[in-house]
């Protein structure tokens, strides 16, 4: 079994959902970013989704866009990013670690070289946010060559044809969107209908995780009670980073408290 399979199996035995925080690597700096990630792990993260900074993150709302720009302003290199990811893996042998990236960055590295670097850094998965399933074959094939799980996004209004396609390609988990649009906290983030969740499960047994707008315990309890395996939370954590940009100790303290609260919410009673 790979790390995702082992993690989901362990959490299922514990009657817990999977909590995956998302942050952008290098925001607000590489040094602080490492402290944030270490805090997330110590405070209960079951896996990590780490964004590689990009200048035009189309799938992301204002909060994550600003996070990308803050990280890019430091002029860090791909070499530095992968060095940190490799260090994270050395310290966390069993933790699933995935990255979210945009296609231009993959092309700039060379597709094969990019996935080799992922493999060499001990990564488990790659989600290319702006590559639809229909255009994913070349990435999918090379990801498999290096034993990297390709992660795909499933919109809440997906039809049967799409669900069938995603069932053919999905590995690790499926990222099910709370709503169409971009990332961010909105008042209209609602629980996914149980019949929609059951429909996806008919096509694929890969765990389903809900993302986009997850920001409080109630949403997490609803997601897991409806049959999902867990949640991904990004903007709510990045809001804390932005709020305390000039108060690192306070930032870390608030992230620790928030992460602990959300992880507790994944436990089925």
Curated annotation (Swiss-Prot):
PROSITE patterns hit by this protein: TRP_SYNTHASE_ALPHA
GO terms, molecular function: tryptophan synthase activity
Keyword NAD on entry: no
Gene Ontology CC: cytosol
Reaction catalysis annotation: (1S,2R)-1-C-(indol-3-yl)glycerol 3-phosphate + L-serine = D-glyceraldehyde 3-phosphate + L-tryptophan + H2O
HAMAP family: Trp_synth_alpha
Family (UniProt): Belongs to the TrpA family.
Subunit structure: Tetramer of two alpha and two beta chains.
Function: The alpha subunit is responsible for the aldol cleavage of indoleglycerol phosphate to indole and glyceraldehyde 3-phosphate.
Entry protein name: Tryptophan synthase alpha chain
């Amino acid at each position: 079994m790979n790390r995702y399979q082992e993690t989901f199996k362990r959490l299922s035995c514990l009657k817990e959902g999977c909590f995956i925080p998302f942050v952008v690597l290098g925001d607000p700096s590489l040094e602080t970013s490492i402290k944030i990630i270490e805090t997330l792990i110590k405070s209960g993260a079951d896996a990590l989704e780490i964004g590689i900074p990009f200048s035009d993150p189309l799938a992301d709302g204002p909060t994550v866009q600003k996070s990308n720009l803050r990280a890019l302003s430091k002029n860090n290199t791909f070499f530095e990013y992968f060095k940190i990811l490799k260090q994270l893996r050395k310290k966390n042998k069993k933790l699933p670690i995935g990255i979210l990236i945009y296609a231009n960055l993959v092309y700039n590295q060379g597709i094969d070289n990019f996935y080799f670097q992922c493999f060499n850094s001990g990564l488990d998965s790659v989600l290319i946010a702006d590559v639809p399933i229909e255009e994913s074959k070349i990435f999918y094939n090379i990801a498999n060559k290096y034993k990297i799980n390709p992660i795909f996004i499933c919109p809440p209004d997906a039809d049967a044809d799409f669900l069938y396609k995603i069932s053919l390609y999905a590995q690790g988990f499926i990222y099910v969107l709370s709503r169409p649009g971009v990332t961010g906290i909105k008042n209209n983030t609602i629980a996914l209908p149980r019949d929609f969740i059951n429909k996806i499960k008919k096509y694929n047994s890969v765990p389903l995780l809900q993302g986009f707008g997850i920001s409080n315990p109630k949403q997490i309890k609803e997601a897991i009670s409806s049959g999902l395996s867990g949640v991904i939370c990004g903007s709510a954590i990045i809001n804390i980073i932005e709020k305390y940009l000039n108060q690192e100790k306070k930032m870390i303290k608030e992230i620790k408290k928030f992460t602990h609260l959300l992880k507790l919410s994944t436990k089925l009673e």
